[in-house]
Amino acid sequence: MFPQAVFDSDDTLTNRVEPLGNYRTIRLKPYEKPYGDIKTMKKHVNESTWITTDLHTTSGESRVSKVISTINDRVGDEGHLLILGDLGKASLSANMTRQYIESVVNSIKTKNKYLILGNHDVYSIDDYVQMGFKFVSDELLVPWGKIKIRFTHIPIPVNKDTVNIHGHIHGSNEYWYTTRRHHYDAYIKWDEDYVTHHGMTSQVQEGFPAIQQLGELFKYYDHERCD
């Protein structure tokens, strides 16, 4: 389905921003600008938006193909997909070619693809735009009723009226968390293992959430935390 992943010592990823080995710092630098219109994104990120993260396309073609198939079945040709980082997985000894990652991205049918950069997303913003993403940034903050949702790759502390939805967690439980500053009782573990990282088994079996499936969670914050 995808071209063979090529690891080449001459592939230096010269377009990387602030490389740390083969990793990047996630915060954008002054000379880097997010791509895409924030106002438009606030309209697109709604109850029918689908979310996934940490695809780590180096984890094996068979597993990646199954995940892409699941995405295409759920999102369809016209749906909206927000990816919370880590399309690939770089290492200190080898780089995955841009061609392979682009082929995986292009196999996702919908043209409405948006990317929040992860620590393994080592290419430039322009590269990800050329791959077909309509929005590329280090984070996205959208209003949601009485609260705000802050989408990031790495979990960050947020104010009491904000929910942080993120990827990146590589703990043994492998669950998404919503994080809130100074509200330790409000750390909520989602019922399904939507962030599956390298194995992806649960993601293939269980799928991944549309924001509409989080309604009870947001209702909880609306009424219990923001009044």
What does each model-found stretch correspond to?
Residues 8, 15-23, 30-43, 48, ...:
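Core catalytic region of metal-dependent phosphoesterases/phosphodiesterases
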Residues 12, 56, 87-88, 120-122, ...:
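Catalytic metal-binding/acid-base residues of hydrolase active sites
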Residues 129-227:
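Conserved beta-sheet core of the metallophosphoesterase superfamily
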Residues 2, 46, 78, 145, ...:
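Alpha-helical hydrophobic/aromatic positions enriched in membrane-embedded helices and signal peptides
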Residues 4-11, 47-57, 148-155, 183-187:
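Active-site-proximal beta-strand elements of phosphoester/diester hydrolases
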Residues 11, 18, 26, 212-215:
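Intrinsic-disorder/low-complexity peptide segments enriched for small residues
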Residues 11-14, 18, 40, 75, ...:
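Low-complexity, compositionally biased segments
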